[in-house]
Amino acid sequence: MSIHKQVEAARSGSEPAVICQIPSGWVVLANWQFLRGYCIQMPDPVVPSLNNLTQLARTAYLSDMAIIGDALLEVTGAYRINYAIMGNSDQVLHSHIVPRYLTEPDRFRMSNPWMYPPETMDATLFNCEHHKDLLLQIKNAIGKRL
């Protein structure tokens, strides 16, 4: 689903992966959960890139991204968080916020998260029932930081 459609679904309450609304937009659990807690941050309103935001909105967006990372460190036990803003496929601003774990094989842990084979990435997809506790824990951890 495109970022535009996900933001529309988040606004209407029909996006099951929504963690919470934040000052700059929305946080959702990513479709891929091969790295537990992988989140996507989406601005609201949707804009083409970070450079299209005012300085104040840009600061808020990046601050929110760090808050999400702090929450993921608390909830998941990850040792580090990877942050990525690319927008090459879906050409609008959104951020990938990915917990990294010491239990990952070195060849993957020492690289970017998209180096995992597709079968590994597709093996654990977001599931409302399975991920509801994780979603709530992340929501609470973000909420206490806002």
Question: Where do the model's predicted regions map?
Answer:
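HIT superfamily nucleotide-processing domains
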Residues: 1-146
